[in-house]
UniProtKB/Swiss-Prot annotation:
Keywords, comma-separated and alphabetical: Calmodulin-binding, Cell projection, Cilium, Cilium biogenesis/degradation, Cytoplasm, Cytoskeleton
GO cellular component terms listed in the entry, alphabetical order: 9+2 motile cilium; axoneme; cytoplasm; extracellular region; glial cell projection; manchette; sperm flagellum
Tissue: Expressed in testis, specifically in developing spermatocytes and spermatids but not in immature spermatogonia. Expressed in the ciliated respiratory epithelial cells lining the sinuses, trachea and bronchi (at protein level).
UniProt source species: Mus musculus (Mouse)
Phylogenetic placement of the source organism: Eukaryota, Metazoa, Chordata, Craniata, Vertebrata
Compartments (UniProt record): Cytoplasm, Cytoskeleton, Cilium axoneme; Cytoplasm; Cytoplasm, Cytoskeleton
The protein's name: Cilia- and flagella-associated protein 221
Coiled-coil region: none
PANTHER family linked: CILIA- AND FLAGELLA-ASSOCIATED PROTEIN 221
Gene from which the chain derives: Cfap221
Role played: May play a role in cilium morphogenesis.
Length: 836
């Protein structure tokens, strides 16, 4: 009976011939599929994504995504929120990362993003090796607003336990105590570290201050405390690790060393026996010389080896150093060195290699700018023309470089060669240009170099200041001597005599003046010894009675429960009424309505018979004043306010409420008045310059609108009083008080006699003023008008002949006067000064 084979066995037998076939033959029979080219993204190629964190429309939270620390062949996720911070709805186009290690996932519920809401994006990171990863998410909004969200992934130290405070206490003087800080790495990547001291101390030593933490290994940092004196010492260190987006670790070490700390009994006895004094003769004492221990030589730091523009570290035993050498390119600077070169301002001190790096960076920047412009499909307008300032700076830079090149080459400097006083030998060949003109040097002789007039003038000025200071000091000393030599008894005696005369009823001023004339002594007061009382201090009463009213002292009294209400009187507020103060009378409105009459009549009044009215012609009276032979055109009258006093406001003398309003003094000869040109007191700086055809000066407004300040008018505040300058220390000297306020030093002895009547000059002036107030008119004279209007002096010869003619008629004289008035008004600057 045959055994039926199972289907699995049949499949296994069928696969056997295929397994025995060569794989190369199978690959040759199968055609490889063609890789399709990726479709270019229009938003990725036509937009520039440079803004971080946020733009005008959206905001990324967080702005930069970090994957700090990861595990290979595992997935890590982080959340990114994109919020709408604008006032309108917006549409978003999120471009995913370009590498396969980062993937994004988000759920877009609506087609637009409402203001205030956010879109949640999940970022998944899948690493395959230990290295640094970088990518970004690009977001395009409505319009041309873009946003860039960078993504960083990097290995970190996971098991780093760095303390923040360590206390090394109770350390003996001369001994040491150490503390070891382990730096452990859990990933197969080397990390560099270095330690900086924020606060240092001599008693602490740290080894090593820099090094490498090996991959999946451990490095130790030892902090040793060796006190050199009693007290407390403290340092603060900072640990930096060469990993991306790392923060420094800080730690504070404190060490103490106190005297007389607890010692063992045997050590205490040993120190006690050594401290006992032993009486040994001086000649038997031995001199022991203590040599200091040789200082430990610090190991020299191995320098890097430069070979064919490559730098090889001295220690190549770790993979970090090997990777550093393999990643180098000949002639390429590091990022740190390139930043230092770009930060320097003076390009003369840079080497040729640094200048080439800067030039290559500028070319690279121009290429990137052209690429961005090509993506924008815009016409490149080119650069601006070279400015004059840039040309001048470039020329000065070339001159400096040429001067430095000549200095390094050893060329002689012309200015220094002309000032050289001795001959110098040079081994260098000097080449001169025969075509150029030789500069001739002509010496100059100055005979006024040795003139000592300025020094002599300065010494004389200082001598004058010193002499003035000595004179003031001597004058002050004489005044102080006179004050100290006052006779106080005579002063008091004269005071008593004057008081006695006042009691008798005499005139104090006449009696005092007569008394001063009789006696030669200058003091006017006196005091007798009987009137001086002794000093008395308050003393307690000897007889103290306990039963007296005040024997028990203050006795507390219970306050009454009755509440007393205080009445506050209120006074009526009285406001000053101006119409009563100025003398105005009240006006009745009712009477004005009944007594008011219109200026124009409603209808014309009736007249009598016009035919019966006889016309009466009145002959005008002729003026009986005889006319002079020479006609006068000076018929103007001065204004009436010239001889009148200024009118004051009634509130100017007594103002009951000055806080409400203030009445100022009226301006005399204000500029708004017509008689301002007759001002007798100028309010401005007078100069000889004036207008053409007038005597009014040009500077009449400088006083009213001046902004300058008289220099030196407040210099007296800078000087110290003479009394304080003569003393050594004004704060330590007691201030003296004046004993006599009416001494002859301050007040004169001979005073003028009292006046019984006005002096003769004042009396004549008052009489003249009274005459002016009576209404006497002041007439202008031809001399006054000639001074004010100098153009009237120059007259035509023809007009002079007409004035000399005495046969003119009165009508022609009036016409001449009117013509002269018109001519005068046309030539004057202020036409309103000439009256009709």
């Amino acid at each position: 009976m045959e055994v039926v084979k199972s289907p699995m066995q049949e499949l296994q037998q069928a696969k056997e011939p295929f397994d025995t076939m060569s794989p190369l033959l199978l690959k040759s029979l199968v055609e490889e599929p063609k890789k399709r080219t990726e479709v270019p993204n229009h938003l990725l190629e036509s937009r520039v994504y440079a803004k971080l964190l946020n733009n005008k429309v959206i905001q990324a939270r967080p702005g930069i995504v970090h994957f700090g620390g990861y595990e290979i062949e595992s997935k890590h996720q982080q959340i990114l929120n994109i919020a709408n911070i604008s006032d309108e709805d917006t549409h978003l186009h999120i471009l995913p990362p370009q590498t396969k290690y980062f993937q994004i996932n988000f759920e877009k519920k609506e087609h637009r993003l409402i203001p205030g809401l956010s879109l949640t994006v999940t970022i998944t990171f899948s690493p395959d090796e230990w290295r640094y990863y970088y990518d970004c998410i690009r977001i395009h909004c409505k319009g041309d607003d873009t946003l860039l969200v960078p993504i960083h992934a990097y290995p970190v130290l996971n098991n780093l336990d760095f303390p923040t405070f360590i206390n090394l206490s109770d350390v003996f003087l001369g001994e040491s105590k150490s503390y070891v800080i382990p730096l452990q790495c859990s990933c197969p990547v080397d990390f560099e570290f270095h330690i900086t001291l924020l606060r240092s101390h001599q008693a602490f030593t740290i080894e090593p201050k820099s090094g490498i933490i090996p991959a999946n290994g451990k490095a130790k940092v030892t902090v040793k405390f060796t006190p050199i004196q009693y007290g407390m010492a403290q340092i603060k260190i900072q640990l930096w690790i060469s990993q991306f987006n790392s923060q420094p670790y800080e730690c504070v070490f404190t060490g103490t060393c106190y005297p007389n700390m607890a010692l063992p009994l045997e050590e205490f006895k040993r120190l006690n026996t050594r401290s006992k004094k032993v009486n040994v003769p001086l000649e038997k004492t031995t001199y022991v010389q203590f040599y200091p221990a040789p200082a430990k030589a610090k190991p020299q730091k191995l320098k890097e080896i430069d070979y064919q523009d490559l730098r090889f570290p001295a220690d190549l035993s770790n993979p970090f150093a090997v990777a550093t050498v393999l990643n180098q390119e000949p002639g390429k600077l590091k990022i740190k060195e390139l930043k230092q070169v770009l930060d320097q301002g003076d390009e003369i001190s840079k080497t040729r290699q640094m200048k080439e790096a800067i030039f290559e960076q500028k070319v690279r920047q121009d290429i990137l700018t052209e690429i961005e412009n090509h993506l924008k499909w815009q016409v490149h307008l080119g650069k601006e023309h070279t400015t004059y300032r840039f040309k001048r700076e470039l020329t000065e830079e070339w001159k400096k470089a040429r001067a430095k090149y000549k200095q390094n080459r050893g060329d002689p400097v012309e200015g220094e060669e002309l000032q050289r006083l001795q001959t110098e030998q040079s081994q260098k060949r000097i080449v001169r240009d025969l075509k150029g003109k030789r500069q001739e040097f002509h010496p100059n002789f100055d005979p006024l170099v040795n003139n000592v007039w300025l020094t002599r003038h300065r010494a004389q000025r200082r001598f004058q200041q010193a002499a003035r200071k000595i004179m003031l000091e001597r004058r002050l000393l004489s005044m102080l001597g006179a004050i100290r030599g006052m006779d106080k008894e005579s002063i008091l005696r004269k005071i008593i005599q004057v008081n006695g005369k006042l009691i008798q009823g005499e005139n104090p001023s006449r009696g005092r003046r007569a008394h001063l004339k009789q006696e030669d002594n200058i003091w006017r007061y006196s005091l007798e010894s009987e009137e001086v009382l002794h000093f008395a201090f308050p003393t307690d009463s000897e007889s103290y009675n306990e039963l007296a009213l005040d024997g028990l002292g203050l006795v507390p009294i219970k306050s009454p429960e009755i509440q007393i209400k205080h009445s506050y009187p209120y006074f009526t507020l009285k406001v000053p009424q101006l119409y009563k103060i100025k003398g105005y009378h009240p006006f009745s409105v009712n009477k004005s309505s009944t007594n008011y009459r219109l200026q124009k009549l409603a209808r014309p009044l009736k007249h009598g018979a016009e035919d019966e009215v006889t016309t009466i012609i009145t002959i005008p009276k002729k003026d009986t004043t005889p006319l002079s032979a020479k006609p006068s055109i000076l018929s103007m009258k001065p204004p009436e306010g010239l001889a009148m006093s200024v009118e004051y406001d009634p509130l100017y003398i007594f103002n009951p409420s000055p806080g409400l309003f203030a009445v100022k003094h009226p301006l005399t000869y204000a500029e708004t008045l017509i008689d301002y040109h007759l001002c007798s007191h100028p309010k401005y700086k007078y100069t000889q310059e004036s207008h053409m055809g007038s005597s009014i000066p040009l500077t009449q407004r400088q006083f009213l609108h001046h902004t300058d300040i008289i220099p030196g008018i407040m210099n007296w505040k800078k000087f110290q009083p003479l009394v304080f300058s003569s003393m050594s220390d004004p704060s330590m000297v007691e201030a003296t008080q004046r004993s006599d306020w009416y001494s002859s030093v301050m007040l004169p002895i001979d005073v003028p006699a009292p006046l019984e009547d006005l002096p003769e000059e004042d009396r004549l002036e008052t009489t003249e003023r009274d005459l002016c107030d009576q209404g006497i008119e002041v007439m202008l004279t031809p001399e006054m008008v000639q001074v004010e209007f100098p153009m009237l002096i120059h007259r035509d010869s023809k007009k002079e002949k007409d004035f000399k003619d005495s046969t003119q008629l009165p009508e022609k004289v009036g016409e001449r006067v009117q013509e002269e008035m018109k001519n005068l008004r046309s030539k004057a600057l202020n036409t309103y000064l000439i009256l009709d």
